[in-house]
């Protein structure tokens, strides 16, 4: 249950665990509804015990008149604790550390400036600065964030052209959370893109690999779980 929930979110609650437990036990038959609820409770209790509690403990004990029947404080929402896991927290730590490291390949200042401003891809000043920043940052993990319509796709297209010009054809790898999204990303960038889960499956079996100098673009990264993002960036 914890592993399944962690694929969908980095932080979860009692109710997330309850929903996943109900989903996984849906095909099991019980004599009564009470039996099903009792088993679900046991599964959720075990899942919470395997999780890391993020919600800080209460600093003081509430008076009895402010406690529920189970002894919890009425000043806190019932089952309002937030949870995560060691695997997710460690993956998050590695991602943050990589965002601080500036040992990754770059594009030379002259090439980045010419390619982002020479008209191959029409860019606004903001898009050009974003593209140049990523090309020259040297960070192992970098971000391009913006609202819909801000021109992220156009910036990524210019970034792909710049990077390929410096590091050669095939030096840009595109990943996306679904096959349809990967197809759309590939059409936008002009390179072959893969579903992230499929790419990792192929990577685990030695059917694909990353080499130094390659730029991995993960589109819609907020839709990917933390552990999945940790793997190709390592």
Question: What kind of region is each of these model predictions?
Answer:
Residues 1-234:
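Conserved ATP-binding/catalytic motifs of P-loop helicase motor domains
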